[in-house]
Amino acid sequence: MQFKQDFFTQLPEFYSQVYPQGLSHPQWLAWSHDAAQLIGLTQPTDELLLGLSGNAAIDGATYYAQVYSGHQFGGYTPRLGDGRSIILGEAIGPNGAWDVALKGGGPTPYSRHGDGRAVMRSAVREFLVSEALYHLHVPTTRALAVIGSDMPVWRESQETAAITVRLARSHIRFGHFEFFCHSERGRADKLLQLLNFTITQHYPHLSCDPSGYKAWFLQVVQDTAKMIAHWQAVGFAHGVMNTDNMSILGDSFDFGPFAFLDTFQEDFICNHSDPEGRYAFGQQPGVGLWNLQRLAQALTPVIPSDDLIAILNQYQEALVQTYLLLMRAKLGLTTLDKSTAEQDKQDLELIGQFTVLMEKNQLDYAQTWRQFGQLDPRSQHSSLRDDFIDTHQFDTWYKAYQLRLGDVTDIAAWQTERNSVNPKYILRNYLAQEAIIAVEEGNLAPLQRLQQVLSQPFAEQVEHDELAKRPPDWGQGLIMSCSS
């Protein structure tokens, strides 16, 4: 790997230098060839294993943990930072640079009495979801690899330590800006330095002046809205949408007790540490705006409040338009025959009515959408109908859907298009759990198989049909722990 060190050299007050503590008896558990290509790598090697497990220095790496703060479950925590993630620098790839981070690399000055380690189960989950979201076309950070070990660590019980090697276009979070506004009062110079660095590195088409700052914040608002719209369309619940887990670039980031929906449930909670459902699936769009408002508060020293409010008011439109684009594709609604505002309203109602029916009839979210690839929309008797207990309500909705859809002349092409946007395979929690159990038993084959299947989520892959089935009773709607 070839590194540059722009963050390290230009922002010395934004991190602490710290070196990883090596894993004992490291071994490759997972490797993403797609992600490896981003930074010019091909195969996992013994030399790379030693370096990424913290047992040998990597040429050009600097090793540091970033400092930031954030709002966690609505309350401000003035000092957080990378408690178990150590960044090596920005690896230069064929199409740009990517931060390389060792998540689970050992304690840092921000570990807050923690051991700085990640357990194998959380490392595998983060790897799988990073790559699964990417192949579902959801904006996300990436995962290069998982490195296992025989090092014992204690959570609720004894587990083994592992490292997820994360790739990110940037590790700058909303919480970085909050830290230098709230926790380090009187350091507006540092806030401005961070803002100028972010724009120069990631928004080079913008200028570092008042007009450029406003254009940048608008881009952040729109990118965040688009990311969350993708979550809602694909049925993804993040679980811990604290502001320190929000990427400034609008990439899905810092995965913990996440879940993809099994049966559709608007108020689904995937995190057992969130009993009130602050971060429930249906709350995510509102939380996204709330988090952006906290970011806006941190930016008041450099952007006038009136401008920030005006830009925040554009969040809803960006969210709705992206969501409509994605959901129209899932339904095959490709024509607009009325004024945009009126059609948008009617389409949102049509989509909302369908998801309400899905929830009322306890239908599997992914499987139901996938059936549109076998649907003949010209037929008066939908193949979907038998899945609904309340067939009368479905018939009413289906007539409205057919009316909105209009004429479909090439059924085969229409069905192929539906299958290209409605995945057959998603990362169900029970599948991840089965793969983790197999790894614990020394068997990597189920993990490798799951990774391969999730890299082609829209393909039929009939030999893997069982991975598309609804979960067994024990795996339905699993709620995960934050411990990792």
Curated annotation (Swiss-Prot):
GO molecular function, one term: ATP binding
Catalytic activity annotation: L-seryl-[protein] + ATP = 3-O-(5'-adenylyl)-L-seryl-[protein] + diphosphate; L-threonyl-[protein] + ATP = 3-O-(5'-adenylyl)-L-threonyl-[protein] + diphosphate; L-tyrosyl-[protein] + ATP = O-(5'-adenylyl)-L-tyrosyl-[protein] + diphosphate; L-histidyl-[protein] + UTP = N(tele)-(5'-uridylyl)-L-histidyl-[protein] + diphosphate
Top-level taxon in the UniProt lineage: Bacteria
InterPro entries assigned to the protein according to its UniProt record, in alphabetical order: SelO (IPR003846)
Binding-site positions, ATP: 81, 83-84, 103, 115-116, 166, 173, 254
E.C. numbers: 2.7.7.-, 2.7.7.108
Residues reported to bind Mg(2+): 245, 254
Active site: 244 (proton acceptor)
Pfam families per record: SelO
Cofactor dependence: Mg(2+); Mn(2+)
Enzyme class per UniProt: transferase
Keywords, in A-Z order: ATP-binding, Magnesium, Manganese, Metal-binding, Nucleotide-binding, Nucleotidyltransferase, Transferase
Family statement: Belongs to the SELO family.
Job of this protein: Nucleotidyltransferase involved in the post-translational modification of proteins. It can catalyze the addition of adenosine monophosphate (AMP) or uridine monophosphate (UMP) to a protein, resulting in modifications known as AMPylation and UMPylation.
Name assigned to this protein: Protein nucleotidyltransferase YdiU
Organism for this UniProt entry: Shewanella putrefaciens (strain CN-32 / ATCC BAA-453)
Organism taxonomic ancestry: Bacteria, Pseudomonadati, Pseudomonadota, Gammaproteobacteria, Alteromonadales
Name of encoding gene: ydiU
